[in-house]
């Protein structure tokens, strides 16, 4: 029997896109998965809608936060409830290729990987393609310091790695920080050179806030990785330039 994959989804006011996200999961050719949805909004107006959409999914858990905790802490709550040998992440407005899990799990087993990711497409709120992004085949800590080339919704990790390392509670770089911490452990990380996800760029997403990105990047380098002020500023500069090149050029 195939290994169980736990799919972690934080939800915060993504009603216009959520059904397409869940449809892309339910249509996966790899069928042995569980969805763990963390409802992270103290406003309960979308909760009935979320439950209705998830009726299509047999194996699921819905966790309702008492208050808004943020995506990092919410994902951690999902990880703690997960049972899968592998854990995959997807944001509540992104979309997967129907063969995403099948190809990724096969790729990880064939190459004895701990962590995998893929190329991805950036789409707008209407689903129109903005740009295709190629991720590097192999990522090491020293390369990751200068450029975050891993889309969260493309990531699948062996679950045992997330028992000791978790997401932080910063607003926009919580995934980047976790990838950095995991890469310091010299785990085997490799990308599939194939586009397996669609990452949705929305006008009101936290990841769209340039000021917030700068603040959180400094926290990643200076507070969490314990790098000095000057080194942190230099790395933020390179991270920003590489992000601009990747997204807009």
Predicted regions span which residues?
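Short, well-formed alpha-helical segments that are part of the catalytic scaffolds
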Residues: 11-27
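Glycine-rich, basic loop-to-helix element that forms the pyrophosphate-binding segment
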Residues: 65-82, 103
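Short aromatic/hydrophobic "clamp" motif used to bind/position activated sugar donors
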Residues: 87
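Conserved donor NDP-sugar-binding/catalytic core segment of glycosyltransferases
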Residues: 99-130
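Conserved nucleotide-sugar donor-binding catalytic segment
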Residues: 138-212
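The conserved acidic donor/metal-binding loop of glycosyltransferases
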Residues: 91-95, 119
């Amino acid at each position: 029997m195939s290994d169980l994959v736990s799919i972690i989804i934080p939800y915060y006011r993504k009603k216009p896109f959520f059904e397409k996200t869940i449809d892309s999961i339910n249509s996966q050719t790899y069928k042995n998965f569980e969805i763990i949805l963390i409802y992270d909004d103290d406003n309960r107006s979308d909760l009935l809608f979320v439950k209705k959409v998830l009726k299509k999914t047999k194996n699921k858990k819905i966790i309702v936060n008492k208050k808004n905790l943020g995506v990092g802490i919410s994902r951690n709550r999902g990880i703690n409830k997960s049972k899968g040998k592998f854990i995959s992440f997807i944001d509540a407005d992104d979309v997967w290729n129907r063969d995403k899990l099948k190809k990724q799990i096969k790729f990880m087993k064939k190459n004895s990987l701990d962590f995998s990711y893929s190329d991805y497409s950036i789409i707008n709120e209407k689903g129109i393609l903005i740009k295709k992004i190629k991720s590097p085949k192999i990522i090491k800590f020293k390369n990751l310091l200068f450029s975050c080339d891993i889309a969260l919704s493309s990531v699948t990790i062996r679950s045992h790695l997330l028992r000791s390392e978790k997401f932080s509670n910063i607003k926009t770089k919580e995934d980047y920080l976790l990838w950095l911490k995991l890469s310091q452990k010299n785990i085997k990380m490799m990308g599939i050179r194939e586009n397996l996800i669609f990452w949705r760029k929305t006008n009101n997403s936290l990841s769209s806030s340039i000021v917030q990105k700068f603040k959180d990047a400094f926290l990643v380098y200076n507070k969490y990785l314990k790098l000095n002020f000057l080194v942190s500023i230099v790395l933020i500069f390179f991270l920003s330039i590489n992000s601009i090149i990747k997204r807009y050029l």
